[in-house]
Amino acid sequence: MLNAWHLPVPPFVKQSKDQLLITLWLTGEDPPQRIMLRTEHDNEEMSVPMHKQRSQPQPGVTAWRAAIDLSSGQPRRRYSFKLLWHDRQRWFTPQGFSRMPPARLEQFAVDVPDIGPQWAADQIFYQIFPDRFARSLPREAEQDHVYYHHAAGQEIILRDWDEPVTAQAGGSTFYGGDLDGISEKLPYLKKLGVTALYLNPVFKAPSVHKYDTEDYRHVDPQFGGDGALLRLRHNTQQLGMRLVLDGVFNHSGDSHAWFDRHNRGTGGACHNPESPWRDWYSFSDDGTALDWLGYASLPKLDYQSESLVNEIYRGEDSIVRHWLKAPWNMDGWRLDVVHMLGEAGGARNNMQHVAGITEAAKETQPEAYIVGEHFGDARQWLQADVEDAAMNYRGFTFPLWGFLANTDISYDPQQIDAQTCMAWMDNYRAGLSHQQQLRMFNQLDSHDTARFKTLLGRDIARLPLAVVWLFTWPGVPCIYYGDEVGLDGKNDPFCRKPFPWQVEKQDTALFALYQRMIALRKKSQALRHGGCQVLYAEDNVVVFVRVLNQQRVLVAINRGEACEVVLPASPFLNAVQWQCKEGHGQLTDGILALPAISATVWMN
């Protein structure tokens, strides 16, 4: 049986001056007479003959090589392999062998040069919902000011840190977390191994979640105001930590001066057809503003308006640019529901405006990290390079949920085996370049989902498997605050509980696992920058290997009973002296002995 081996990393892809050397390994019987490298120049398909190499990379392994000219053409170099016999042909792509030529966007792809933020793939991100992470002392009186929350029809509720979260008035209940509280807890985050923070919205807004922006140019006084963000920026820089903000540009809040539903005298668009901001929103014939998904407090912004476009992203002091400049110097934006942003109350010309946001950000801060929020398929935006990455729900979170927690995003039952899970993950990332895969934003859960610990239910023993997976799969791992100490909770608002700072309320063994996995990732170039090959996926067991030059990291996930797994022969496993770095599995002569419900990591 013929087998082919290729990953878009060294030793298979190497740059030599103005050429990119592409190598394919073959093992097994019935080798082809010829191999052509299918590549493209300015979107035109080309076939380049590959040459069989005299030297073998390993005994029994044959290498074929060809070169791609880098002196011209687009930076994203897509390619696949056409194997030819005298009477037939087969194609080899990221998803294996096929009798059909691959779709253009499902080939191997590398970016040379890579214009994305070079720092992103090395990070350990930590997502913070500011009101629920840490409360600073002393506090300004303005931070605990009680006001009427129009969207909820009541005054906001202030609670003590240890009071339980309830379903009542979820968007109006405040626990007092703030940005100075985050600053005070940076030593804790440093101890965990965190290198970058992603904050849910911090700008002035009436709700606790702040997705109903009232002022894009000032931090909410409840969080400590502009000064607290400056202090946090300074403190994170002192520790070498990155800081990414949440940009809510699909809609504003209805209390924003631009809209002014509640008649505060700003001349907003809601009640004033002559308002200078009237065309920043869309209205039906009866004068009702078009909103986001039926939430009247979140009127949609209309990007048909040139003046709105200038205010949000195009202008020299636009909102997007403002927070990336000194003295703020933020490291990027997470773009809320970015796929829905557009014109005339909908998503018309969405791609044009998302590209404009990213272009403005990169002009201001070339290394800015732009992450789009997509619960669905984000590849359309990624393939068009209008985002650096997406929150990887579709390519990581949801298949992992299906395999370990047997549920989907609608919390409906979903039973999938290892083969289905890996086919799902591999199919999704096949549409992305290698560098894009490394920048995808991977999470087990977030402020918009139930906590993964809660989703597991009676299968709570599988939680460590997910943690190991998070730090070993291609992409940027992000911890949702509190996951590392065992915080649980169903969907909003229960997934937004205050952080349990009392040690007796923390799962210290889980915290230690997070620390170990973060340390492993930081030590391993293969985990941060390597390719990924699934070696085995059947029933309850997933085995994959990360590869970069001579570095190897082998990962085995077993959600079921103790078992033995015979790995298929692979040159990725040959001549490797393995050391077990996490877990208790054993590897002997290509046979894995895996304990029940376990995750094991080996490195060479």
From Swiss-Prot:
Pfam hit, one: Alpha-amylase
Catalytic activity from the UniProt record: Hydrolysis of terminal, non-reducing (1->4)-linked alpha-D-glucose residues with release of alpha-D-glucose
Active site as annotated: D336, E373
CDD domains named in the record: AmyAc_CMD, E_set_CDase_PDE_N
Annotated site, Transition state stabilizer, chain positions: D448
GO CC annotations on file: cytoplasm
GO biological processes: alpha-glucan catabolic process; maltose metabolic process
Record keywords: Cytoplasm, Glycosidase, Hydrolase, Maltose metabolism
Major localization class: cytoplasm
Primary enzyme class: hydrolase
Hydrolase is among the record's keywords: yes
EC identifiers of the protein: 3.2.1.20
Keyword Hydrolase: yes
Induction: Under positive control of MalT.
Subcellular location per the Swiss-Prot or TrEMBL entry: Cytoplasm
GO terms, molecular function: alpha-1,4-glucosidase activity; protein homodimerization activity
Family, per entry: Belongs to the glycosyl hydrolase 13 family.
Subunit structure: Monomer.
Function: May play a role in regulating the intracellular level of maltotriose. Cleaves glucose from the reducing end of maltotriose and longer maltodextrins with a chain length of up to 7 glucose units.
Protein name, entry field: Maltodextrin glucosidase
Species assigned in the record: Escherichia coli (strain K12)
